[in-house]
Amino acid sequence: MTGDDRYTVISADCHAGADLLDYKPYLEKRYHDDFDAWAATYVNPYEDLLADTADRNWNSARRLAELEADGIVAEVVFPNTIPPFFPKASLMAQPPTAAEYTMRWAGLQAHNRWLADFCADAPGRRAGVAQILLNDVDAAVQEIRRTKAAGLTGGILLPGVPPGSTVPELYSAAYDPIWAVCDELDVPVNHHGGSASPPLGDEPAARAVFMVETTWFSHRALWHLVFGGAFRRHPGLKLVLTEQGSGWIPGVLEMLDYYHGRLVAGGGPPASQFWGGRAPGVGRGPRRVWGG
């Protein structure tokens, strides 16, 4: 490049969402009364979403102006505000129980509809990331198809599955229809840092422990999908690990290759003891998977 050339800067990790009450038109009408009752008593726990600057999450003109002032011309848009029927930001929420699922799923679908309109307001400059839940795989697959058709180009946000969750771990074959449709439609699977940590309680040290451990819990998605065979069955599947740094990747790939070689490729007693005859389902070594 010469000194006169200009870089194109795209942010791969921006966040946005609607103001709380503005989600109502995007909800199915059968949930409107429930939404009114919930919104009337809901107290937002985030100071930044109560401040005068909160509208940068949903004010399209302001957002474009501020991004351009920073030299950014386009963005990948993750969620940031509170969708209907959630206690806090959906990115950090635990997987819903069976009793919570129906309402929260309706809330995420409302966000996805809002996001499609928000992205359409700046064509080619916003790659919206659609949200799904893992409780109902068939419903998630339908939503992936719908949001792709609606113009959301940032992929899906893969929810975290902390240990002890109400849904299967990410290596489970139950999620194969999700990987299949993402491969078919060329939909990236985004896993954002902070979304897979277990609840830590209210002890004074909990916040510090969360900050130390949160990226590690998010890293787990990589080896779950590798050893679960998702990339073998769906070679076009793309996993994006966001807000997790990158310095950890070489060491983790070395570790994963070690266990792949010992428990899978070796085929000896360790494979019989620890892998239960499932070695062929994993496919290539982790480093080869990473390299494409």
Q: Which role fits each region the language model picked out?
A:
Residues 1-292:
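Helix-coil boundary/capping segments in enzymes
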